[in-house]
Curated annotation (Swiss-Prot):
Transcription recorded as keyword: no
Protein name: Alanine racemase
Its biological purpose: Catalyzes the interconversion of L-alanine and D-alanine. May also act on other amino acids.
Cofactor(s) the protein requires to work: pyridoxal 5'-phosphate
Active-site residues from the entry: 34, 259
GO cellular component, one term: cytosol
Keywords: Isomerase, Pyridoxal phosphate
Reaction(s) catalysed (UniProt annotation): L-alanine = D-alanine
Protein's pathway: Amino-acid biosynthesis; D-alanine biosynthesis; D-alanine from L-alanine: step 1/1
Entry's EC annotation: 5.1.1.1
GO BP terms: D-alanine biosynthetic process
Length: 364
């Protein structure tokens, strides 16, 4: 009873992919399942999303895990390869690679592969992280075209740095740069992430790369409301994180609650102790007042988050009982709200769920 539970609704996951495909019917879906499927389970997500056109993972280990469990769909490794041994595995296991630096090009030229490789040339249009500059990209593209180790045509991609910003100036500049530099290049193109998918319909080219929206979470957080209604109407949260009440206490006015005595009862009142803490991945920096959902009603967090427990104010739920489920985020309580309260983003909360949490799959 005292383990927190992450309930993964695989029906919602499939639904979200179908919505993405319906909204971009001319594009193929290269779905992002890196970082353990955004915390939802790498293999679980891949098996549920069998209708995806390709999977995107961060590193070769994630790709090999998918191949080992029988996933045969195209898999593209976003960070590519870094030595000859890895490159050989890419060929052996039919993995696609994002090419973003000259060292990778050199490895391709000097390594004898058993089969040719599917690659995507990453063009840095302003993210300033990975990729070849706009000025370098034509020469690299021409160099890759001559390689017998590479399947043709070569994929062409960029990554948007600021697509979740209501100010569109920089993102429009990135898109303009990408279209300009690739004008004379032949190959499938890919530009948008989840935020770009909604905000920049002109960039819905051959391939789209949905990530956080697959899991029913807005890429805009709670501050950018232009697409709020559309997202809430069409997409469903996949993960619901819950834990049970393990104790109920009646505290007196001015009693403090939790480490550091940071919160005191304003009056005589009931509180509940809930079996979840930062050891499970609940954010330690969530402040008093952060909402949880108990029997359909909001109750506020009180006091500091401990490793294994939190305390909540029961004044609005005086009939709560030990064993009742408390929803920390998910169905009925968007994780974006919790992230905002904790001063972080939903992505981080999802990815920080620990092994102590029990995962359950449902179809609902």
């Amino acid at each position: 009873m005292n383990r927190a539970t992450a309930t993964i609704n695989v029906t919602a996951l499939k639904h979200n992919l179908s919505q993405i495909k319906a909204l971009a019917p001319k594009s193929l879906a290269w779905v992002m399942i890196k970082s353990n499927g955004y915390g939802h389970g790498l293999v679980r997500v891949a098996k549920a999303l069998s209708d995806a056109n390709a999977f995107g993972v961060a590193c070769i280990d994630e790709a090999l895990t998918l191949r080992e469990v029988g996933i045969k769909s195209p898999i593209i490794v976003m960070k590519g390869f870094y030595n000859e041994a890895e490159l050989s595995q890419f060929a052996r296991h039919r993995l696609g690679a994002v090419i973003h630096c000259s060292d990778q090009v050199s490895l391709l030229e000097k390594t004898n592969l058993t089969s040719s490789l599917s690659v995507w040339l990453k063009i840095d249009t302003g993210m300033n992280r990975l990729g070849f500059s706009v000025e370098q990209s034509p020469a690299v593209y021409n160099q890759l075209k001559t390689s017998s180790s590479i399947q043709k045509p070569i994929g062409l991609m960029t990554h948007l740095a600021d697509a979740d910003n209501e100010n569109k100036t920089f993102t429009e500049l990135q898109i303009k740069r990408f279209f300009s530099v690739t004008e004379k290049m032949i190959g499938p193109k890919s530009i948008v992430n989840s935020a770009g998918f909604f905000a920049y319909p002109n960039a819905l080219v051959d391939w789209i790369r949905p990530g956080i929206i697959l899991y029913g979470i807005s890429p805009f957080g709670i501050n950018y409301n232009s697409f709020k209604e559309k997202i809430e109407k069409k997409f469903r949260p996949v993960m619901t994180l819950s834990a049970k009440i393990i104790a109920i206490k009646n505290r007196r006015q001015n009693d403090s609650v939790g480490y550091g005595c940071t919160w005191s009862c304003p009056e005589d009142m009931p509180i509940a102790i809930v079996s979840i803490g930062y050891g499970d991945g609940y954010p330690r920096h969530a402040p008093s007042g952060t909402p949880v959902l108990l029997n359909g009603k909001i109750c506020p967090l009180i006091g500091r988050v401990s490793m294994d427990m939190i305390a909540i104010d029961l004044r609005s739920q005086p009939n709560a009982q030990v064993g009742d489920d408390v929803i920390l985020w998910g169905e009925g309580l968007p994780v974006e709200i919790i992230a905002e309260k904790a001063g972080t983003i939903a992505y981080e909360l999802l990815c920080k769920i620990t092994q102590r949490v029990q995962f359950i799959e449902i179809e609902k």
